[in-house]
Amino acid sequence: IQSLGGQLLDKSNAINELDIKVESLTLDVSNLNSQLKSRELAIKDLSTRLGITQSEVEELTPVVKSYFALGVSGNKGIVIPLEVKMSKGTGIVSVNIKNVELKSDAQDSIRIATKVSQDYTGVDLSEKDITVTFVNDNPFIVSLDGPSAGAAITLTIIAGVLDRTPSSAVLITGTIESDGDVGPVGGIEEKASAAASEGAQIFLVPVGQKVNSPGIEVAEVKKIQEVVNLVLK
């Protein structure tokens, strides 16, 4: 009997030890679950912060679009690389030039281009700084009538707002009016020849200024909407 009682006591103690181990394991599992939940919350918080940071980075990163304007040097047309850079700002519009002589009304033309771009896209540009750059890599100065590049500038700003790419196969000359009309300019024949030499397939001109030019199709446009449809990819 004493032996049986001892065995029962040993089994009882073993059961108690198992109960203690089970309670300990249960507590460990509970602590582990708590730690996992805490880490999940930390990961979610970090993801949210990274998302905000990524959004801020995208907002601060300038948008740059490249196209071409056309000028005249003597009796020869010249294709001039044009770049528009847009970044977060306060509505400042500025111009950079290299070996390019701009007429005094160029700044006004760019401001009109900005307004027309805003009207066309429906995007408020008052919190964007816009820099328009003309670079002539030739060793001589090229004269560029500011208004005559208005349509090209407008198109490039619109490309920046819509994040689309202007096609170099279609070039344009023409002023831009506040209502979105493309207005008349000079030097059409010289510019058409330069556009063809640059490899363009189509040269867009204001209504009433179409000319015949070897090696390139010359087409008339009236509104900036037509230009966007033909040039932006």
Model feature map: region roles:
Residues 2-233:
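Peripheral, non-AAA+ core regions of ATP-driven protein-machinery
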